[in-house]
Each structure stands twice: as structure tokens, then as C-alpha cells.
């Protein structure tokens, strides 16, 4: 047996032991990681649902006050605008606003200027799964 093959076998054995050790650690800690990630995911879902409820309630009230029909897609557009504002893409915000019917642009501007919505959205972005 040559020196090269012996060194290769030793390196292979050490690699296997290291890999098995990592797998053992991952197996024992995986339940903790799983529980933590589920809790974070539930927290994100709760915050997201609260934002959606508020947007929808405000949209329905806006439609009633203005006497215009409720636009079901306005919730998704508001989400997109909140995300774009949070990321700082002002040019993209203008592009999206041009696609929205004129009677709903004031509503979307109000949503984007609402500091409470902005703080909730930034709180949502802080929770990472």
C-alpha cells in the first residue's frame, strides 16, 4: 500500500466521521429549529392577515364613501405598493399607480402614506423564517 492511498483513506475516514458528527448534531437540533421556524411563520401569517384585513376594511369604507364599486384586486395592488415603498422603488410605484383606475389612486396614496401600515409592513419584513 502506498503512502498516497493511505493518506487518501485517512482523509476519507476523517471526512466520514465529520459528516456523521454533523448529521447527529443536525438531527438533535432539528426539532428546535423546526419549532422556532413554525413560530416565526405563524407570526408572519398573523401580521400579514392583520394588514390584509385593515386594507380590505379601508377599501370597502372608501368605496362606500365615494359611491364606487369595490375593486377586489385593490388589496393585492396595495400590498405591491407597500413592498415597493419599503424597498424604495419610487419609479416602479409610479408605473403601478398608472395602471390603477383613477378613482382608486387617492385610496392607494392614503394607504402608502399611512405610517401604521408602514410600521406593520416593516415589522413583517423583520420576522424571517
Swiss-Prot record:
Keyword NAD: no
GO cellular component, one term: helical viral capsid
Sample GO molecular function, one term: DNA binding
Keyword entries, A-Z: Virion
SUBUNIT field: Heterodimer composed of major capsid protein 1 and major capsid protein 2.
Highest taxon of the lineage: Viruses
Organism lineage string: Viruses, Adnaviria, Zilligvirae, Taleaviricota, Tokiviricetes
Purpose: Self-assembles to form a helical, filamentous nucleocapsid mesuring 400 nm in length and 20 nm in width. Together with capsid protein 2, wraps arounds the DNA and maintains it in an A-form. Capsid proteins probably maintain the DNA in A-form by non-specific desolvation and specific coordination of the DNA phosphate groups by positively charged residues. This certainly protects the viral DNA under conditions such as the extreme desiccation of its host.
Keyword Metal-binding annotated: no
Protein name listed in UniProt: Major capsid protein 1
Organism: Pyrobaculum filamentous virus 2
Localization annotation: Virion
Amino acid at each position: 500500500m502506498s503512502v498516497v492511498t493511505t493518506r487518501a483513506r485517512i482523509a476519507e475516514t476523517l471526512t466520514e466521521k465529520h459528516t456523521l458528527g454533523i448529521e447527529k448534531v443536525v438531527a438533535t437540533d432539528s426539532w428546535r429549529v423546526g419549532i422556532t421556524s413554525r413560530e416565526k411563520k405563524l407570526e408572519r401569517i398573523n401580521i400579514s392577515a392583520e394588514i390584509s384585513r385593515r386594507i380590505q376594511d379601508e377599501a370597502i369604507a372608501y368605496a362606500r364613501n365615494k359611491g364606487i364599486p369595490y375593486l377586489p384586486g385593490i388589496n393585492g395592488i396595495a400590498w405591491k405598493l407597500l413592498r415597493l415603498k419599503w424597498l424604495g422603488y419610487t419609479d416602479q410605484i409610479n408605473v403601478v399607480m398608472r395602471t390603477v383606475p383613477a378613482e382608486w389612486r387617492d385610496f392607494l396614496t392614503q394607504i402608502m402614506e399611512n405610517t401604521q401600515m408602514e410600521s406593520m409592513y416593516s415589522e413583517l419584513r423583520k420576522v424571517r423564517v
